[in-house]
Amino acid sequence: MLSGTDKHGFAVLRSSPLPELEAVMHYMRHERTGLELVWIERAEANRTFGIAFPTLPEDDTGVFHILEHSVLCGSELYRVKEPFVELMKTSMNTFLNAMTFPDKTYYPISSRNSKDFINLMRVYLDAVFRPLIYEKSEIFRQEGWHYELAEDGTLSRKGVVYNEMRGAFADADELEEDAIMRALYPDTPYRFVSGGDPEHIPELTYERFLDFHRRFYSPSNAYVYLDGDVDIDEVLGILDGEYLSGFAAGERIPVPELQRPVRAGEQRVVYELPAEEDPRERYRLAWGRVAGEITDRVRMTAMQLLCNVLCGNNQSVLTREMLAAGLGEAVSMMLWDGCAQPFIKLEVRNISEDKLARAGEKLRAVLGGLAENGLDRRELEAAMANLEFQMRERDFGYYPQGLGISFGVLDSWLHGGEPEALVEVGTLFDTLRARMEEGYFEELIRSVLLENPHACEVVMVPSHTAGEERRERDAKELERLAASWSEAERGRVRSQQAALDAWQGSSDSPEALAALPRLELSDISPEPEEYPTRADELGGVTLLRHELPASGISYVSLYFDITGLGGEETAAVSFLSELLGKVDTAEHPAQELSRLTQLHCGNMSFSVDVYDNSADSYRAKLTARVSALESGIGEALGLLAEVLRSSRLDSEKEVTDILRQKRTGMMQQLMNNGHVSAIGRAGSQLAAGPAANEWANGYDYYCWLKRQNAAPDFAALSGELAALAKRVIGRRGLTVSVTGMPCPAVDEAVAALLAALPEGESVSGPGIAARGVRREGIEIPSDVGYAAMGALGGEFDGRWQLAGRVVSLEYLWNAVRVQGGAYGTGMVTRVNGFDGCYSYRDPSAAKTLGIYEKVPEFLRAFAASGADIAGLITGAISAGEPLLTARAKGEEADDLYFRGITHEMRRERRAQMLAGTNADLAAVAEELESIFARPGVCVLAPRAELGRCALDEISTL
């Protein structure tokens, strides 16, 4: 296909086989502009395209983050306000987004539909090279920042990125890592916050914003990535004929020079703490250590392994020593590899100020001893086995595999390395095992962690008042600024505000919308993807088999029924799931168990999961999951049986350490994913399943952890956990799921596992009921909030799925995100009948609740308009069928099984969507009008905003 050296103006520089992917990587350069391109040619139906630009910040205004948002707000060919949203509405994409990194901006898409893939690629190319930002300053003001003058003269700032970063800066981890990068890279672009510091975002002018696009978004500074079964002749023809031929060669932004070593000393950063938290034990100590260069793969992988061996869990050698000494609640170590010179962050979390010095001394003493006396070779071998499994598995979770691979390609390519250098595993671990015998890892401890001339320390200082002081400071600055303006300046701001309001409130013309490429409904299969499931019985236990190619890996899940438990017991089982695999068993101490698990398992995890298909019933499961190579599944399931059968729950130190860590982690999770917390909490007022999930994974579980931590009675807790383990872990009520290809060794291992388990007891009881409708608020330390409102609707079907998509993208996106300044928003429609709306990083939660109340009115008017909804149908179907790995397909099949959703039911819902009409939407609007009369409400926000939400009750995180 690529014979010859020139194709549509592209010279093929070389082609390199990638046997692990059964692929060939072609490396090309566009001769006229210098644009570089790689294509991983392989038989992969999910095609990926991405275009990346090295974007090196020169200040903290977040200009490249704002550009990332803004170029997707209209272009020369696609002159609609938000092509990105139109694509969300109308495409069958498996990925559609854009990303700002500290030194690059990346615009990737993927799709299983070849026509859709080309459509998406065209829109993205026009967006980055020909955006409407030069014609429409309103784009900058909407996505970046702008002033707003209220009728009473009160001045405020708004903007999507501005509010996003206000929320990000409520995260202590974000503040800590920003401080480390400022300290370690004082002479490079990495010292700046690429996402933007809210204090500095308002310093960015429209003119400077445009200048950065001119300088950095040229074909000569672009890198294109392709993966999969791509029609390369068509793609190169589009690139050259429609875009690159119109550009001359320009300047390629050089790779930034490496930072010379600096000893930055100690930095102190204040962060906001929830009001009920005692600040005395909430200091953090973080070491920042530059680890080398990102293109040095052996060294970077070795540092990942060191992170695991030293601090991978509570039994890892450095963490264990620190916790035993009472120095910190948790100790972690990670490789931060999003830059040319990755750094190690070694953190001791939740410690008193008077112990900071001792913590630093203890870290040095333990690391010094390890460097001198050597690491446990068995621990290193286990860590290598586990990391090699993960790297060869290439399961990137939310990201499609082609996109996940692209991150490694760009890491090497944009920093002067070969694009294929980080793609395959090859002999990497053979090299590391050989170097292990030469003392390589001990030398890294010395050179990177102990004697590194390129280092800093950051102390995070907790404060109850920091957030309020900042908000008062901002308010006074805005008040002073407004008072200093002349009437002409006020008029200019009001004029810009009016222009922005008019633009945001305007509709795209039919001609502009028609120009956007889109699929026809006839391009969409009426058949949803089927997840193969065969239900068998083995030893009285239900066995679900999902026969799927999985590269020689088996995925085994055990589901122990806990449906009848009450709230307190469900929370205790959820905490039990945190302990399993982390505490001693009758056969092995926790440290040895951890080593064996890493050696023999790709993954071993435990959780509590809730499945429902109606408002008044649900199924709750204690879930155990294991993945391993088929050849090693016997050892893996043997370890799982040991953990389930004989975990020791009576070790006070280990259990209370995990309790405190989980409580802190849950607090951070509730703040960072407040929209999930809010919508889940609202749903729990109305339906039993969400109420059970609150006790298993939500705010009720967090409150249970707080109570256990505040008034510890270890004997009672240990006794309850042991009694629950005996009650729920057994063959009675158990369902086992196996995903992978048929394999006798797997069948034998599963049979042996079941034989090793006790019979168990029946878990009976009334379970957990819905909490009852109310308007509740949870105070969080943040400048932005998360608002949710919902109600129980009629029977879930394809009409409701379509209506949720229409409300999300035709109404909430514009009203809450575009005009309201929230970073995210949407409507969910769930199989249990719950229908609700949420917002994310929202500066005006109270106003947003009012917008939700008008959803029925909007939907009724939309249906009456007779709008063409074919594209929205396409997008709704796509949203319900994401790209899944074999592992994820098995888990989705289990989910459907427990909810009682058959393939025929899914086919019927798809048929309902494909046949959807405005009359269907009108019918849903009438139902929404009725159910939204008394909805459930939950808002997570700062205290002042909660006071504007007319709430019945307020608690504090």
Question: What is each of the regions a protein language model found here?
Answer:
Residues M1-T48:
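Non-catalytic terminal extensions that flank enzyme cores
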Residues E41-A43, G50-A52, Y162, R166, ...:
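His/Glu-based metal-binding/catalytic segments typifying zinc-dependent metallopeptidases
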Residues N46-L56, E82-R130, S137-E148, E174-E199, ...:
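M16 family metallopeptidases and their MPP-like homologs
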Residues V63, L67-V71, L576:
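Active-site His/Glu-centered metal-binding helix of metallohydrolases
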Residues C73-G74, G196-A222:
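A conserved hydrophobic secondary-structure block that centers on an alpha-helix together
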Residues K158, L210-E242, L717-A752:
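Non-catalytic, conformational "gating/processing" segments within enzyme and secreted inhibitor domains
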Residues E443-E530, R681-E779, R910-A911, A915, ...:
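Long, compositionally biased intrinsically disordered regions
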